[in-house]
Design a protein with these regions (language model features):
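N-terminal periplasmic/intermembrane-space "pro-region" immediately following the signal or transit peptide
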Residues: 8-90, 94, 102-103, 117, ...
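Transmembrane beta-barrel strands of outer-membrane/channel proteins
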Residues: 45-53, 93-97, 142-144, 197-201, ...
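Hydrophobic, lipid-facing positions within transmembrane beta-strands of outer-membrane proteins
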Residues: 73-79, 123-128, 180-184, 235-239, ...
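Outer membrane beta-barrel
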Residues: 87-216, 246, 423
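Repeated loop/turn-to-beta-strand initiation elements of outer-membrane beta-barrel proteins
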Residues: 88-91, 137-140, 192-195, 247-250, ...
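Outer-membrane beta-barrel "beta-signal"
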Residues: 190, 420, 432-446
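Detector for outer-membrane/organellar transmembrane beta-barrel domains
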Residues: 255, 291-311, 315-389
Length: 446
């Protein structure tokens, strides 16, 4: 359109000089190509190969011998189709599939059926949504999508709407772990404020390590899990009010959702004594968050109140919890970002029995995350150090990751690094303290 307007103005200015050639000039201008707008559709994706080598398991380890050495050799294809529809509406369909050859190389008979079912191969749709404006100030987005409420890159407080893929903890960042769910999201805009209402129709929980997988902490299978159905009375609800201003922003949040962390219950059996079963409590969250930019510094804060927490040893006695997170991010060095986030989770009316099997929770749980990211060679090489540690003073366990990614050319990236797991007071970290690994990735994007 800019080209056409410019051409029109030029034609008017030259009319007096070209009076005898109006028809010829008009024909020439008409035949010139104009700037094309966005196409109706765009298909993108990537093909990647990743491998990890677990070097810390010894021949004397009584468990996880099958994961010694080559722990993963995964080939993955991801595709994303974006559609540009009339009236500025958009749609997306994306999915992925992978196959992990390490299980066949190491011998499939050495692994449990549960581990093979969830980790050897997978084919699934990811984001599938339709988005557009119903009114000038009202937008709709419906379908499988991701809504990130959090301010931290590593720690979750108010970011409760999407479950996580926790099957291989520590290898990638949270932004690559979120799992989309089917939602209806309405956004109403008024000046700097946005009012959001969300209905979550799909019941989906964290994908955790299955029995027999490398990161499953015990040698016996878990009890059966009760997963609520989709929609109806199981619909999850959420709302947010967000204000974005010069140098700072603030938001208020509310959600009524299922706890991703299941608790153990004894449920009546048709015959005989009650049987154990994993259940998901219905929680209510009230939260607030904000960012404040000050020169090269970014201050981050999140706070949330959770009601309805259930535990095995306190059957019928729901608990509440306060999560408060503060963070700093500094970007004053060239091509470098440093961040530190700390969260404290406090259970009100704590009972010391909760510290024991099978609940394993503490009255006050502290989580600290430190991240250092720097770039070299005109941003073609990126190095990241990440440490996430639990407890005070850092006695709960955690992990450290050092990784590098190098862009060989525009569409081809290779990378690798090391992940070190630290044991501690938390049983899960203590069980996985020998899962240290080297990893490598190669990805071609198109």
């Amino acid at each position: 359109m800019c080209l056409c307007a410019h051409t029109s103005r030029a034609q008017e200015e030259l009319d007096d000089l070209l009076e005898g050639f109006e028809d010829e000039l008009e024909e020439i201008i008409t035949d010139q190509p104009s700037d094309a707008g966005p196409g109706l559709w765009e298909l993108t994706g990537d093909l990647s190969v990743s491998a990890s080598y677990a070097y810390a398991h010894t021949h004397s380890d009584p468990i996880k011998r099958e994961y010694r050495g080559l722990a993963a050799l995964r080939t993955q294809l991801r595709l994303q189709l974006d559609l540009n529809l009339p009236r500025d509406w958009r749609a997306r369909v994306s999915g992925r599939g992978f196959y992990d050859s390490a299980y066949r190389i190491q011998g499939r008979r050495n692994f449990t059926d549960e581990a093979l079912d969830t980790s050897e191969d997978e084919l699934e749709f990811q984001e599938i949504w339709l988005q557009g404006s119903l009114l000038p100030q009202l937008d709709l987005k419906f379908g499988r999508q991701i809504v990130n409420w959090g301010r931290s890159e590593t720690i979750r407080v108010i970011d409760v709407l999407n479950p996580l893929d926790n099957r291989e903890p520590g290898l990638v960042d949270i932004e690559d772990l979120r799992l989309p769910v089917v939602m209806t999201k309405l956004d109403y805009y008024h000046g700097p404020w946005t009012l959001t209402g969300i209905a979550v129709h799909e019941t989906r929980f964290d994908e955790n390590p299955d029995f027999g997988s490398e990161f499953f902490p015990i040698a016996v299978p878990p009890p059966p899990e009760n997963t609520p159905g989709n929609g109806g009375s199981n619909t999850e609800w959420a709302a947010a009010l967000t204000g974005i201003f010069s140098g700072w922003d603030v938001s208020l949040h509310w959600a009524r959702f299922f706890d991703d962390t299941a608790h153990l219950e004894l449920v009546p059996a048709a015959i005989g004594p009650p049987r154990p079963q994993l259940e998901h409590a219905r929680l209510t969250m009230l939260g607030a968050s904000g960012n404040y930019a000050m020169g090269n510094w970014l201050l981050k804060a999140e706070a949330a109140y959770f009601d309805g927490l259930e535990y095995f040893v306190l059957a019928g006695d729901d608990k509440t919890r306060w999560d408060i997170m503060g963070g700093l991010e500094y970007a004053g060095f060239d091509d470098t970002t440093i961040s530190l986030d700390v969260v404290r989770r406090h259970i009100s009316g704590f009972d010391s029995r909760l510290e024991n099997d099978p609940d394993f929770v503490e009255n006050n749980r502290v989580e600290t995350a430190f991240r250092y990211t720097t770039e070299f060679m005109n941003s073609r090489l990126r190095a990241t150090y990440l440490a996430t540690i639990f407890g005070t003073p850092f006695d709960g366990g955690g992990f450290m990751r050092l990784s590098c990614d190098y862009e060989l050319r525009d569409a081809l990236t290779v990378g690798g690094g090391i992940v070190l797991y630290m044991g501690g007071d938390f049983p899960t970290f203590e069980a996985n303290r020998k899962n240290d690994r080297l990893f490598f990735t190669a990805k071609y994007s198109f």
